[in-house]
Every structure is written in structure tokens, then in C-alpha cells.
Amino acid sequence: MFTHFNRGIPSHPAMPAELRAMIAGEDVCDFHHYVRVRMREGWHKLDATWHDALISYGFPVNRDWKGHSDTVLAATPIREYPAVEDLVAWKEQLLTQLTPEQRDFRAKFFTTLTEWMMTL
């Protein structure tokens, strides 16, 4: 799915100021992926992006998921794409649709977010 990934992340005082500014600032364009699985009830969306340890920071985790419905997605879909066999190649192709500035900002955002998470 295409999303503005930073819009699904809560800003928290424990985060560095730079990360909080990026969350509130310009859109971080991303092509986020989750699993679609067929269960007895039909097709469901499964997204295991955020660990339960992020609950206290306000992240949308799936701790209470019982296995009979969609999980909470890490970001709000703006555009959905069909399932593909080679996900890595597909994502690489999608990323080429972003401007160089969008790709650079996206990379900086995910690096900054990951660096903060590694301190937790």
C-alpha cells in the first residue's frame, strides 16, 4: 500500500526532537507491506510492524488480536496494490516513482526512527 508512513506514528516526548519534527512535518511517502491471509472468515490483513514494547509510546500494536480479524495496520492506506510474487523487486520499482528528495527524506526518516527504537 502507498501511505504517508509518518502519519501513523505517534509523537512522544521520549523521541529526539528531530524525529518528532519529522513525524509532524512533511509527508514520508512509503510503500508499506503487510500479509493477506485467507482464514475461515475470509481474507484478513496481518501487519506485525510494531512490537508490543511500543505500547507505552502510543504505537498501534496488535497485542489484543485474537486471530479472527484484520490487525491494526502500521499506517493508513492511501492506495492499495495487488499481491505480487516478487515483493522486493516490486517495492524497488515503486520507490523509483518517488522523487530523489522524497527518497532521501524517507531514508532519513526511517534511519532516525530505527536509531531511536534501538535505544529502547
Regions found by a protein language model. Name each.
Residues 4-120:
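His-Asp-centered catalytic microenvironments across diverse enzyme cores
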